[in-house]
Amino acid sequence: MIKREFLPESAELKIKLTADSKKWAEFYQKAEQKQAAKVSLRGFRKGKVPLEKARAYLNPQAVFELALRMFLPELEKQAATNIIDSDNVIESPIFNIVNMDKNNLEIEFLYPVYPEIKLPDYKNLKTKFAIKKITKEDIELQKQKLLEAKGRFIEVNRPVKIGDVINFNFKGFIDDEPFDGGEGENFDLRIGSNSFIAGFEEQLVGLEIKKEADIYVTFPENYQVHTYANKKARFRVKINKIKENKPAKLTNEFVASLKIQNVETISQLEVYLENLTERENIERAKIDFQKNALTEIGEQVEVPLAKKLINLEIERLNEVFHSTLKQQEIPLKEYLKITKFTEKDIYDQFEVEAKKLLKNSFIFAEIAKLEGLVPTQQEYESHVEKLAKFTGKSVQEISETVSYNEIQINITNQKVIDKLIEFNHEAKDEEIVNKNQNDNEI
């Protein structure tokens, strides 16, 4: 007997079936025989103990699990014959045992399906794509950054200023007790880089070489070591060295030395920097828009997620996490010690992130479906070429290492963002949006 049931609240198709009792009995007997072959009894060679005598030593749970494992592929095939195209099944199933004994087996398969999604009016979002207007100050700042990057650092004997690179020692205390990871010696820091928690670098300004001072800060709420979050801390610091940046001088000779194509004079450099700033502003606007638009849409829609999909995404995040630790040569135990996390804390974080990523992926997919956004072969080839150029690999290498489906999803998601920008941008940016839409750059 087979029964189908769609579960919209979990986006699953449940197929429940009662196994053929004769077949189940056969698999159970095979499992008994395999388990009996592992039994050792005095007077019998290993694997030669009669089943009648071996049964008393068998683990019933192990027999059931083995029988089910052997029978499962056939049962899954049987269940799959009851799936139709309109079910929109998107992944292999998980299963639950409804009833199981030596003579009977009832099992249900839960197939993840494309969820029912009712999107809000994504064509009229409160979030708008807005490009920051370029000012003369922006161009001057770009020039200054370039000159500083091409400049040199010299050691000075004066109080610390913004932009300096200092070498210093520090030791942190919470409730007047030293804490793990809060101490360092001969640490280099660019003042103004915001590498440390808020307020730390600002209090270093004005300090002098060889003199000690106390700095008071509060760890942020979302700090990576969660036991330190929102805690007040005191850092004892000592400046060892101060280096000041001596920027390069802006001349036509300097510009020519940069070897930028078609840029040989100061005026040409300014045009180049203006174009660069515009591209940066567009890219920054896209990133902000995507984040805020997805948040706005996500807050107005419920997306049911199948347990199997959540588990697969958690597994993927876990693999990436462990791969990153391995690359950085950090043992898991050491990471847990430093961060004060437990493995359950990490799993819980992965679960939250997995649900968020899956929800966003279905929002992308639903908009793509409604707007008829399908990648073309030309777009696929162009995307592969860009990846090859960016990574320094050949087109063939990219095609072999990055799956076709993954590239198609990336292109589709980009088309969705472009479409949302088309619907939700400020009037002042109409010309830039239209130009870049035509050039496929937004």
UniProtKB/Swiss-Prot annotation:
Q: Which UniProt keywords apply?
A: Cell cycle, Cell division, Chaperone, Cytoplasm, Isomerase, Rotamase
Q: What is its main location?
A: cytoplasm
Which reactions is this enzyme annotated as catalysing?
[protein]-peptidylproline (omega=180) = [protein]-peptidylproline (omega=0)
One cellular component term from this protein's GO annotations in UniProt: cytoplasm
UniProt xrefs under Pfam families: FKBP_C, Trigger_C, Trigger_N
State the domain notes. Answer: Consists of 3 domains; the N-terminus binds the ribosome, the middle domain has PPIase activity, while the C-terminus has intrinsic chaperone activity on its own.
Q: What is this protein called?
A: Trigger factor
Q: Source species, please?
A: Mesomycoplasma hyopneumoniae (strain 7448) (Mycoplasma hyopneumoniae)
Its gene name is tig
